[in-house]
Each structure stands twice: as C-alpha cells, then as structure tokens.
C-alpha cells in the first residue's frame, strides 16, 4: 500500500491523549503499516505503553523523541519491527518492558541510553539479538528479567554495571552464554534466579560467577566491627540467599544482625533452609506472617523475644516444625 493513505502535513501532538487519538485515527484510515511520521511528538515526555498489544508496524523512524523520559512497555507484546535506529533517547529514564514479548529485532546499537535507570524486562521474550555492546548503562539500577526467555547472546562483557542493584531473573531461560567475568558488581544486591535454566547455567559458568558475587556481597555488608547488619527485610533476604548459596541450606545465619528488621513475613516460606537462627535478636520485629509456611526449618527458636510482634498469621502452617509438634510456645496466631 502507498503512504498516501495516511500521509499528511505535520500535526503537533499537544499531549499524550492527543497523540493517542492521532495514532488511532491514522491506523483506522491507513491500516497498521501506515506512516506516522506526520505526527510531531517533540512535546511528548510520556510514551509508556503507547503501542502496548498493538498491531502497528508502520513507520515512526523520524519521530523526535528527544524529550521523552518514559518508554516503559512502549512496544509491549506488539507487532512492531520498524526502524527506530536514529531515535534520540538521551532523556529516557525508564525502558522497563519496552520490547517485552514483542516481535522487535531492530538496530538500537547507536542509542544513547546514558540516562536510563530501569531496564527491567527490556528484551524479555523477544527475538532480539542485536549489537548493544557499546551501550552506556552506567546509570542503570534495575536489570531484572532484562533478557529473560530471549535469544540474546551478544557481547555485553564491557558494560559498566557498577550501579546495578537488581539482576534477578536477568537471563532466566535465555540463550545467553557470554563472558561477564569482568563486570563490576559492587552495588549488586539481588541475583535471585539470574541464570536459571539458561545456557549460561548449563555451561557451568553460573556457579563460579555467583560464588564471586555472593562472597563480595557478604564482605561489603560488614560494618567496621566486622558485623553483617541487615537494615531491612529485603537486605536480610539477600543475605540469606548469599549464605545459603555459599554454604548450603543448613548454614548458620547467626552472623547476621537482624536487630533493626521490623518485617519478616514470608522470609522462609517454601524454603529448604534448616540451619541455625537461634540467636537472632528479633525484638523489633512487628510482622512474622507466613514466616515458615511450608518450610523445612526444624531448628530451636524458643528463646526468641517476640514481644513486639503484632501478627503471626499462619507462621508455621505446613512447616516441619508444625508436623513435628515443635512449634515454639510463644506462637499465637
């Protein structure tokens, strides 16, 4: 089909709602492969979910997106495969799920992503396998699920990931098997299931890489007196994951100072942990809901000070402690 069906003079999109109306009208008149370059989007800052679940696969190569800050889920589960290689994305802060489960496999090698902080799920479930080796990801903090279930196996070994805190599920079920041995992971907190069922795991590389990451994490979690302090539930969960990975499910976790943690809900839910936490100072904990639900934990925690706990809902339901009749005497649902 010719472009004439929806080609016209430039129309400035006043705001996000106006942009959506222009796109809808153009597609209705010209079909999903029409040319949308007649729309001036230079005033638009928010493009979150703009083509979410869309059949659009036309031309937006000339769009001026230089003021856009949010491209999260922009092409989420869409049919789009067009050329956006020349886009100026230098102000974009979020690309969360931008191409999630989409058909996109285009060239984005020259994109300036230096302002992006959130790349979670960016290429998850896509056929994308392009060159992004030169991307400046120095400001990215979240990469969870970034390449999950994708075919990506490009070179990202020189990326500066020193500010990334979350890489959980990053390569789960992916084809990635590259060299990331030189990554600086000084800020990394969460690597849960990072390589699960991936080629990286099957190649045997994940154990060595995670061993280094977890050990570094524990080392930098120590204070000046050598104590490992958990400031909150999330940090505590990360410390537990690290200790169990390095030392197994029967490890001693009494080295973790939990005196500042207030929330412990679901902490060992469905967990294989069966080590020692008898010396934990839980005197400031307020919620222990489902803490050991369906867990294998069978240790002695009778001496815990739970005087400030307000809720213990189903704390031991389905647990080994319940089955053995060893639920602590202080437990009150």
Q: Which residues does each predicted region cover?
A:
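Negatively charged
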Residues: 1-333
């Amino acid at each position: 089909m010719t472009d004439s069906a929806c080609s016209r003079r430039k129309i400035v999109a006043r705001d996000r709602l106006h942009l959506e109306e222009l796109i809808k009208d153009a597609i209705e008149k010209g079909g999903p492969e029409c040319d949308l370059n007649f729309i001036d989007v230079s005033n638009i800052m928010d493009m979150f979910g703009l083509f979410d679940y869309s059949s659009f696969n036309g031309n937006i190569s000339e769009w001026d997106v230089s003021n856009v800050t949010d491209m999260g889920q922009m092409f989420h589960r869409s049919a789009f495969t067009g050329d956006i290689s020349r886009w100026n994305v230098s102000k974009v802060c979020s690309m969360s799920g931008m191409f999630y489960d989409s058909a996109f496999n285009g060239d984005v090698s020259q994109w300036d992503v230096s302002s992006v902080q959130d790349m979670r799920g960016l290429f998850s479930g896509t056929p994308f396998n392009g060159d992004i080796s030169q991307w400046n990801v120095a400001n990215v903090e979240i990469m969870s699920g970034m390449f999950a279930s994708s075919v990506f196996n490009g070179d990202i070994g020189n990326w500066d990931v020193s500010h990334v805190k979350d890489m959980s599920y990053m390569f789960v079920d992916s084809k990635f098997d590259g060299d990331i041995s030189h990554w600086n992971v000084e800020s990394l907190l969460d690597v849960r299931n990072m390589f699960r069922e991936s080629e990286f795991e099957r190649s045997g590389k994940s154990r060595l890489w995670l061993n280094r990451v977890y050990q570094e994490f524990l080392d930098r979690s120590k204070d000046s007196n050598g104590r490992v302090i958990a400031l909150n539930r999330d940090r505590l969960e990360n410390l537990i994951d690290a200790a169990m990975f390095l030392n197994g499910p029967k490890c001693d976790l009494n080295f973790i100072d939990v005196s500042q943690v207030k929330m412990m809900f679901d902490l060992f839910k469905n967990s294989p942990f069966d080590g020692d936490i008898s010396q934990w100072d839980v005197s400031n904990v307020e919620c222990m809901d489902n803490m050991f639900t369906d867990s294998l934990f069978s240790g002695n925690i009778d001496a815990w000070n739970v005087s400030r706990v307000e809720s213990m809902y189903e704390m031991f339901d389905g647990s080994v402690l319940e089955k053995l009749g060893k639920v602590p005497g202080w437990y009150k649902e």
